[in-house]
Curated annotation (Swiss-Prot):
Pfam families the UniProt entry points to: Ribosomal_L11, Ribosomal_L11_N
UniProt modification remark: One or more lysine residues are methylated.
Coiled-coil residues: none
Subunit structure: Part of the ribosomal stalk of the 50S ribosomal subunit. Interacts with L10 and the large rRNA to form the base of the stalk. L10 forms an elongated spine to which L12 dimers bind in a sequential fashion forming a multimeric L10(L12)X complex.
Keywords: Methylation, Ribonucleoprotein, Ribosomal protein, RNA-binding, rRNA-binding
Record PANTHER family: 60S RIBOSOMAL PROTEIN L12, LARGE RIBOSOMAL SUBUNIT PROTEIN UL11M
Similarity remark: Belongs to the universal ribosomal protein uL11 family.
Function of the molecule: Forms part of the ribosomal stalk which helps the ribosome interact with GTP-bound translation factors.
GO CC annotation: cytosolic large ribosomal subunit
Protein's GO biological process: translation
CDD domains hit by this protein: Ribosomal_L11
Name the UniProt record assigns to this protein: Large ribosomal subunit protein uL11
One Gene Ontology term of the molecular function aspect: structural constituent of ribosome
Length: 142
């Protein structure tokens, strides 16, 4: 018989840096989950990732206080900032340009994010990435 799901918890945790301090500890502790068990399992699964890459994670909480978690790909903004070699996006997107990304970089990001996006083709994913780039104040060059 399947376990009864009591809730979901979405967090964004740096790769290989999960520890019981806030925000992870209190979020898991309030729901009665074993914080160290999550931290060890998450850090073990993110060993091959670049250190401190933000990893979105969805934790499924069961009635017996056990849990499973699913890791997503890093946020699109993270990939765009890396590609443009900038620290943050533009304060006034549309007016000020924060940097520039090429179509090849956009395609690469779209292919990495494909499994988490709600689209079927790489071209559709590319248009989503381009939209995110524009909203960050990045220009998409040919």
């Amino acid at each position: 018989m399947a376990k009864k799901v009591t809730g979901y918890l979405k967090l964004q945790v740096p790769a290989g840096a999960a520890n019981p301090s806030p925000p992870i500890g209190p979020a898991l502790g309030q729901r009665g989950l074993n914080i160290m068990e999550f931290c060890k399992a998450f850090n073990a699964q993110t060993q091959k990732e670049e250190k401190n890459t933000p990893i979105p994670v969805v934790i499924t909480i069961y009635a017996d206080r056990s849990f499973t978690f699913e890791m997503k790909t890093p946020p699109m903004a993270y990939f765009l900032k890396q590609a443009a070699k900038i620290q943050s996006g533009s304060k006034a997107p549309g007016r000020d340009s924060a940097g520039q990304v090429t179509k090849a970089q956009v395609r690469e990001i779209a292919e990495k994010k494909m499994k988490d996006l709600n689209c079927d083709t790489v071209e559709a994913a590319m248009s989503m990435v381009e939209g995110s780039a524009r909203s960050m104040g990045l220009q998409v060059a040919e």
